[in-house]
Amino acid sequence: MEGITGKELILAASAIGAGLAMIAGLGPGIGQGIAAGKGAEAVGRQPEAQGDILRTMLLGQAVAETTGIYSLVIALILLFANPLIRLL
């Protein structure tokens, strides 16, 4: 029986790392849901400030989404363009 080669170990670790990176997408999703709920509450309390509330909420959600996008990019790099495999 043969042992695990270096390439197989890197591929397995990359798959685990990609999965962990995608778990990082949960945080922004939960945060954006809370922000949208609070924005809806704020508009309900002050309908005349709807434009300001919407603008601030969308800016905050865009900033929060960058974390999810970065984790997706890292996962895609680990799965499809892994630079560590070339080192073997």
UniProtKB/Swiss-Prot annotation:
Mode of membrane association: Multi-pass membrane protein
GO molecular function: lipid binding; proton-transporting ATP synthase activity, rotational mechanism
Keyword Transport: yes
GO cellular component, one term: plasma membrane
Alphabetic keyword roster: ATP synthesis, Cell membrane, CF(0), Hydrogen ion transport, Ion transport, Lipid-binding, Membrane, Transmembrane, Transmembrane helix, Transport
UniProt-annotated location(s): Cell membrane
Primary location class: membrane
Matching InterPro entries: ATP_synth_csu_bac/chlpt, ATP_synth_F0_csu, ATP_synth_F0_csu_DDCD_BS, ATPase_proteolipid_c-like_dom, F/V-ATP_Csub_sf
Bilayer-spanning residue ranges: 10-30, 68-88
CDD domains attached to this UniProt entry: ATP-synt_Fo_c_NaATPase
Site residues by UniProt (Reversibly protonated during proton transport): 65
Subunit (UniProt): F-type ATPases have 2 components, F(1) - the catalytic core - and F(0) - the membrane proton channel. F(1) has five subunits: alpha(3), beta(3), gamma(1), delta(1), epsilon(1). F(0) has three main subunits: a(1), b(2) and c(10-14). The alpha and beta chains form an alternating ring which encloses part of the gamma chain. F(1) is attached to F(0) by a central stalk formed by the gamma and epsilon chains, while a peripheral stalk is formed by the delta and b chains.
Protein's job: F(1)F(0) ATP synthase produces ATP from ADP in the presence of a proton or sodium gradient. F-type ATPases consist of two structural domains, F(1) containing the extramembraneous catalytic core and F(0) containing the membrane proton channel, linked together by a central stalk and a peripheral stalk. During catalysis, ATP synthesis in the catalytic domain of F(1) is coupled via a rotary mechanism of the central stalk subunits to proton translocation. Key component of the F(0) channel; it plays a direct role in translocation across the membrane. A homomeric c-ring of between 10-14 subunits forms the central stalk rotor element with the F(1) delta and epsilon subunits.
NCBIfam families to which the protein is assigned, alphabetical: ATP_synt_c
Family: Belongs to the ATPase C chain family.
PANTHER family for the chain: ATP SYNTHASE LIPID-BINDING PROTEIN, MITOCHONDRIAL, ATPASE PROTEIN 9
Record's protein name: ATP synthase subunit c
Lineage, top ranks: Bacteria, Bacillati, Bacillota, Clostridia, Peptostreptococcales
